[in-house]
UniProtKB/Swiss-Prot annotation:
Domain Helicase ATP-binding residue range list: 76-246
Keyword list, A-Z: ATP-binding, Cytoplasm, Helicase, Hydrolase, mRNA processing, mRNA transport, Nucleotide-binding, RNA-binding, Translation regulation, Transport
Biased composition (Low complexity): 437-482, 543-569
Name by which UniProt lists this protein: ATP-dependent RNA helicase dhh1
Gene Ontology CC, one term: cytoplasmic stress granule
Region (Disordered), start-end ranges: 1-39, 436-569
């Protein structure tokens, strides 16, 4: 017995340094992609400089967070002191972790009370934020609950019977639970608002002020956003105590995002989008429209062209929205068409291209849209399809943001948005398990039960797009007359998106992207061409450049107004 004890003592060694505990961590593969100064311009601090809880540090490192970003360096030490914070930083620079980490550090797991309330404007952002809380705090024994509208109250009421330390949700649902005295916020010391500018708009402000009445008077209030209108200052003066202001917006747009515009007639936009798909090397893309009807119509057209596509908007059933959000995050589909529902805070690092099929009306919406690419200092591409009515909005947005959106060139350098090893791009923090693949008809019925089958076109592609090579293209974005295929018209849509005066000259849809398994009326079979010759954009001065239906010169004046009526917005 004594010999065995002696052998064990010989085999036992004391810790040789403070870093030994890191050797047993389950660290993800390191992201070796290039990063811009948006996240690298730091003071050189480490997580250990302001976080001393080893269990929290384990969650931080296992989530792949190697060094704090500038907003995290500025906000976390102040938040730990309990002071109110007004923090403004660019999209995709780590604002979520900047308030989640200090909140986790200050929570006492032994106290069975709600100790932190995090408000977000959308349901998708609520789910994403709750997953960040769960992942970073997985070693702390902290319970996180997410609650949003669109679902029944029963599950939330049952869940709140058990200890909950952090509640993440949308304002209306939280107010409903607090008003019914189901959620006890009387001892909740932390009140956090992400995307605070949206939450303090006229739509949400009355709800926010009512929610504050359920909190103790000595609460800590923290506001985070990329844009702060005057409504934020009014709220701060009324409800915050000497807030510490952080402003890291030396410029408004992310440095890693390259912005272009293509001037194109409304009825030629689908042709232009088809060309972009076939020429650009897209890992994942988000395509924005200005209305829910146009979202569904465009998703239908994209699927008919032979590309995998999901769509999402606010009028969909919550279950369908959840499935689309999770599947797209996990790489099930390459392209997502959506309204402004997903412009706020959604973090999908595999997205390298954002396309504004409908140009936004204001600079704030534009800034949040293009911020879906180029996440956390990485590279991205934003392409805007501009018609004649958008020319003044383009000028105003350039002026308000202090940036210049260049005309799209014949050739786009791959180094601006393409990574050599897309399979190494990390997926967002998520514990979601992909839903088993269902037949096409079931998927259509789960998304829009009230629609007919012919109006539903969801792809059943299940292979993650970040493990597929980016769509290959020769980067020559103009139409190539020598590469024409036999002419075949694009299927007619429910709108004036098909040109009445001829079609552009192109090679049609590329076969490099995964194609859906079902096609309406036998359209879109592999190998078919969707090219055609046409005059594109024509002005008074004669025929213009046919790339993208004609690329216009100066944006504020010119003689090339499109002929004929544009389609209805």
């Amino acid at each position: 017995m004594s010999d065995q004890l002696a052998d064990q003592l010989k085999a036992t060694s004391l810790s040789s340094g403070p870093e030994d505990w890191k050797k047993g961590l389950n660290l993800p593969a390191r992201d070796t992609r290039q990063q811009t100064e948006d996240v690298t311009n730091t003071r050189g601090l480490d997580w250990e400089d302001f976080i001393h809880d080893r269990d929290l540090l384990m969650g931080i490192f296992e989530a792949g967070f190697e060094k704090p970003s500038p907003i995290q360096e500025e906000a976390i030490p102040v938040a730990l002191t309990g002071r109110d914070i007004l923090a403004r930083a660019k999209n995709g620079t780590g604002k979520t972790a900047a308030f989640v980490i200090p909140a986790l550090n200050k929570i006492n797991p032994k106290v069975s009370k709600i100790q932190c309330l995090i408000l977000v404007p959308t349901r998708e952002l609520a789910m994403q934020t709750s997953q960040v809380c769960k992942t970073l705090g997985k070693h702390l024994g902290i319970n996180v609950m997410v609650t949003t509208g669109g679902t029944g109250l029963r599950d939330d009421i049952v869940r709140l019977q058990d200890p909950v330390h952090i509640v993440v949700g949308t304002p209306g649902r939280i107010l409903d639970l607090a008003g019914k005295q189901v959620a006890d916020l009387s001892e909740c010391p932390m009140f956090i608002m992400d995307e605070a500018d949206k939450l303090l708009s006229q739509e949400f402000t009355p709800v926010i002020e009512q929610l504050l009445q359920f909190h103790p008077k000595d609460r800590q209030v923290m506001l985070f956003s990329a844009t702060f209108p005057l409504s934020v200052k009014d709220f701060s003066d009324k409800n915050m105590t000497s807030p510490y202001e952080i402003n890291l917006m030396d410029e408004l747009t992310l440095r890693g995002i390259t912005q272009y515009y293509a001037f194109v007639e409304e009825k030629q936009k689908v042709h232009c989008l088809n060309t972009l798909f076939s020429k650009l090397q897209i890992n994942q893309s988000i395509i924005f429209c200005n209305s829910t009807n146009r979202v569904e119509l465009l998703a239908k057209k994209i699927t008919e062209l032979g590309y995998s596509c999901f769509y999402s908007h606010a009028k969909m059933a919550q279950q369908a929205r959840n499935r689309v959000f999770h599947d797209f995050r996990n790489g099930v589909c390459r392209n997502l068409v959506c309204s402004d529902l997903l412009t706020r805070g959604i973090d999908i690092q595999a997205v390298n291209v954002v396309i504004n099929f409908d140009f936004p009306k204001n600079a704030e919406t534009y800034l949040h849209r293009i911020g879906r690419s180029g996440r956390y200092g990485h590279l991205g591409l934003a392409i805007n399809l501009i018609n004649w009515d958008d020319r003044f909005n383009l000028y105003n947005i350039e002026r308000d943001l202090g940036t210049e959106i260049q005309p799209i060139p014949q050739t786009i350098d791959k180094s601006l948005y393409v990574y050599e090893n897309p399979e190494s791009i990390p997926r967002p923090i998520s514990t979601f398990k992909p839903i088993a693949q269902q037949p096409q008809q079931q998927l259509q019925q789960s998304q829009r039960p009230q629609q007919s089958q012919q109006q539903q076109h969801f792809s059943t592609q299940t292979q993650p797009s970040n493990q597929l090579p980016p769509q290959q293209g020769n980067q020559q974005l103009g139409f190539n007359p020598q590469a024409q295929q036999p002419h075949r018209p694009i299927p007619q849509a429910q709108g004036d998106w098909q040109g009445q005066n001829g079609r552009q000259n192109g090679t049609g849809a590329s076969n490099n992207q995964p194609r859906p398994t079902n096609y309406q009326n036998n359209r879109g079979q592999p190998g078919s061409s969707r090219g055609g010759r046409g005059r594109g954009f024509q002005g008074q001065g004669g025929r213009q450049n046919q790339n993208y239906g004609g690329q216009r010169g100066p944006r504020t004046q010119g003689q090339g107004q499109p002929q004929g009526p544009l389609s209805a917005q």
